[in-house]
């Protein structure tokens, strides 16, 4: 199936759903060679992935994932996993926003990995903050129940990705797997804040999310940043069931003066972790403001706020009341099995 799919993609043709699924099945089971995988991913990138292809790939990956079964609880499960690859070198904004949103009462099931192309992935910074990435299923359940947030480490929940690692590293370009990460949450998150670095993905992903059954999502692209930006305008596509809304957000709408992207730089993992600690300890400035705005979106998607303005207020309260800092400490201790 992989050879037939490769030939079709090289010819510039989109794959039928069944053929796309068959190709991904070959990859996930180790039936495809590194040469075939590398060629297939490169050809797909050159052709441009179609929504039907991406949805089929994601469905197969979900089947091969180690699922996280959520026990009880009320409200939506929200993920703040972006595609990464924006090369902006910012601190890990989505992780800070996830912790703040959890402190505001949103149930966060953050799916992520170590950095592939940026300086610091969500797994890297959480580990630096003290979170145990090698959690047992019981520890994962405990972190969600007690902290309101769990980190689902991609390396644990997607063991079949080992078949792709070598080819991805060798070709060294963004591939469809950068897109698939946020679409394959092991908990089946029903709401997502999904950051993308390329405006073209704003058109690709809405029908994919609808096909996969996501209830509510915001796909955001902040001038090449895969977050809601405070440096420039952010293009947003909001998916609510069958409805798709497109609009632009600016920092000025929320009373935030535009910042220079340099003010959001994270450097290495130690610096990024220190910035997040500072935000949770109540430090002001550009890093706090962009965290508030992205946390606001997660709070809105989680159904705790009627709009982003209310979300910003709730995010600020989460930090200023100390709830967000307590959330991080609870996440750390429960991930280690200490409570």
From Swiss-Prot:
Record Pfam families: Glycos_trans_3N, Glycos_transf_3
Cofactor annotation comment: Binds 2 magnesium ions per monomer.
Gene3D superfamilies tied to this protein: Nucleoside phosphorylase/phosphoribosyltransferase catalytic domain, Transferase, Pyrimidine Nucleoside Phosphorylase, Chain C
Native source organism of the sequence: Methanosphaerula palustris (strain ATCC BAA-1556 / DSM 19958 / E1-9c)
Name of the top EC class for this enzyme: transferase
Record's protein name: Anthranilate phosphoribosyltransferase
Binding site for anthranilate 2: 168
Catalytic activity: N-(5-phospho-beta-D-ribosyl)anthranilate + diphosphate = 5-phospho-alpha-D-ribose 1-diphosphate + anthranilate
Keywords assigned by UniProt, alphabetized: Amino-acid biosynthesis, Aromatic amino acid biosynthesis, Glycosyltransferase, Magnesium, Metal-binding, Transferase, Tryptophan biosynthesis
